[in-house]
């Protein structure tokens, strides 16, 4: 079994579960750490829908929770939240939790091709039924496309240099493994002062491209509002600035009453306020949690409540 330490576990689930007999969604089931805690907070009348796009996570989860009657585990990307809830004949929910990014299961299994610390095929698919792999991105995208992805999704200042080197190397032979890509990046990018691996940002960028992560988040957040009851909550844990920015802007937009230009004296947009932001500043892990689980260091939790 893979080691899995859920991030901001008590903080996120305490905000999420306000009614023990309510209906909740764990939109990023993973290895079930948050789901387990949510179920502990629910009464026998409460119900949890757990969603994940990773089939392996679903199979492990079904085995782990096979004796539990008030959870339904579904294989689906969270961007199809509406289809999942409609299929289950659920009209409204009391809360939804998103724990974004790559899971421990995906990172810790070398053959999944997510980690720059392993030597395995460049895969990076969260859903193994999807077609696009990291190999395709690295070996088939143009230099301009690679540069854009690495710059935008990795926020990497050396994007141009890395893209150029990828194209140069792949002309000699395809880049097939995580180690090859890691070594390539390390050969052209100086090591940061904090000692972290220079490949980190590029691997993040390629992973986001392969899985369409940012667009999925935007779609899922919009859909979640439609299903939330009044008083229901959206809790989102993000791990890098791109994710956090999407969540922050989404919460801000839906917490505004009017978006008309300031020089218009009377509101004509007709926009209604839908959310109250409960976390003015994001909640971050304690020093103790970071010491216990290094992967939690960049986590941020934001919470909003449906009006």
UniProtKB/Swiss-Prot annotation:
InterPro entries: RsmH, SAM-dep_MeTrfase_MraW_recog, SAM-dependent_MTases_sf. One of its GO terms (molecular function) is rRNA (cytosine-N4-)-methyltransferase activity. The keyword Methyltransferase applies. Keywords: Cytoplasm, Methyltransferase, rRNA processing, S-adenosyl-L-methionine, Transferase. It catalyses: cytidine(1402) in 16S rRNA + S-adenosyl-L-methionine = N(4)-methylcytidine(1402) in 16S rRNA + S-adenosyl-L-homocysteine + H(+). It is found in: Cytoplasm. It comes from the Bacteria. Disulfide bonds: none annotated. It is an enzyme of class 2 (transferase). The keyword S-adenosyl-L-methionine applies. Pfam families: Methyltransf_5. PANTHER family: 12S RRNA N4-METHYLCYTIDINE METHYLTRANSFERASE (PTHR11265:SF0), S-ADENOSYL-METHYLTRANSFERASE MRAW (PTHR11265). Specifically methylates the N4 position of cytidine in position 1402 (C1402) of 16S rRNA. This is Ribosomal RNA small subunit methyltransferase H.
């Amino acid at each position: 079994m893979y080691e899995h330490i859920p991030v901001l576990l008590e903080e996120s689930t305490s905000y999420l579960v306000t009614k023990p007999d309510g209906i909740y969604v764990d939109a990023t089931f993973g290895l079930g750490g948050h789901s387990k805690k949510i179920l502990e907070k629910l009464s026998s009348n409460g119900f949890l829908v757990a969603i994940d796009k990773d089939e392996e996570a679903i199979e492990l989860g079904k085995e782990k929770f096979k004796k539990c009657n008030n959870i339904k585990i579904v294989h689906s990307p969270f961007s199809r939240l509406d289809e999942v809830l409609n299929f289950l004949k659920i009209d409204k929910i009391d809360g939804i939790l998103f724990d974004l990014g790559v899971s421990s299961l995906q990172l810790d299994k070398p053959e999944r091709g997510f980690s720059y610390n392993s030597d395995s095929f460049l895969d990076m698919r969260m859903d193994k039924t999807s077609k696009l792999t990291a190999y395709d991105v690295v070996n088939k995208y143009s230099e301009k496309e690679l540069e854009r992805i690495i710059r935008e999704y990795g926020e990497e200042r050396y994007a141009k240099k890395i893209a150029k080197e990828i194209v140069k190397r792949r002309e000699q032979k395809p880049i097939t493994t995580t180690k090859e890509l890691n070594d390539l990046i390390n050969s052209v990018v100086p090591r940061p002062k904090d000692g972290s691996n220079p490949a980190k940002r590029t691997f993040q960028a390629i992973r986001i491209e392969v899985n369409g992560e940012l667009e999925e988040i935007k779609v899922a957040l919009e859909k979640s509002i439609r299903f939330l009851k009044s008083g229901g909550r959206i809790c989102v844990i993000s791990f890098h600035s791109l994710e956090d920015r999407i969540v922050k802007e989404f919460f801000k937009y839906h917490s505004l009453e009017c978006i008309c230009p300031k020089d218009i004296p009377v509101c004509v947009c007709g926009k209604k306020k839908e959310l109250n932001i409960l976390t003015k500043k994001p909640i971050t892990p304690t020093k103790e949690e970071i010491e216990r689980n290094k992967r939690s260091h960049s986590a941020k939790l934001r919470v909003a409540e449906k009006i």
